[in-house]
């Protein structure tokens, strides 16, 4: 009998972990399918090109192996999101060695919005009214202005300092509700330049 492949890669070796319970996909199966989709669905890559080049460790090609990790991992059942690069900055491989669960609020905090900012550095936009570069930080969906600058580098430096402080503040706020490794990673997080 041939295994049904999910996105041409993933399979279920039919172990103890269920894919469906009470007519709905289990949390572990949905997380696994979503991970596979982000890495191997070409239609998804057209919508979210940041996932181009991402892959899944061969150990997790089997749903049973992923589910075993999922249910033994802290915060897997708390509605948190699977993250591959908070512990290993720039990581492109989903694996049991690099993945953790983090709250959505922290996950989106670290997005760089490269596609929406054009050629300017992160946290910088051109302010037509002042004819200067404006540094701004998004806090809870609102922009906090950090100042106006004569060049994009100075604006970005201001943004970098504010963003790193904000990430540390969020780590302190979430301490005790996130894995210790996530807390330490956030406390030491630096914006890539």
Task: Please place each PLM-identified region on the residue numbering.
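A short, exposed loop/beta-hairpin motif centered on an aromatic-Gly-Thr core
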Residues: 54-58, 142-153
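Short, cationic Gly/His-enriched loop motifs
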Residues: 18-41, 46-132, 136-137
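Arg/Lys-rich, low-complexity, intrinsically disordered N-terminal tails that contact nucleic acids
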Residues: 1-25
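Structured segments of extracytoplasmic/periplasmic soluble domains
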Residues: 38, 69, 162-165, 169
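An aromatic-rich alpha-helical recognition segment common to small helix-rich domains
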Residues: 124, 135, 149-163
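Glycine-centered small-residue hotspots that permit tight backbone geometry or close packing
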Residues: 10, 83-85, 123, 147, ...
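Extended, polar beta-sheet/loop recognition surfaces of beta-rich domains
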Residues: 7-9, 106, 166-193
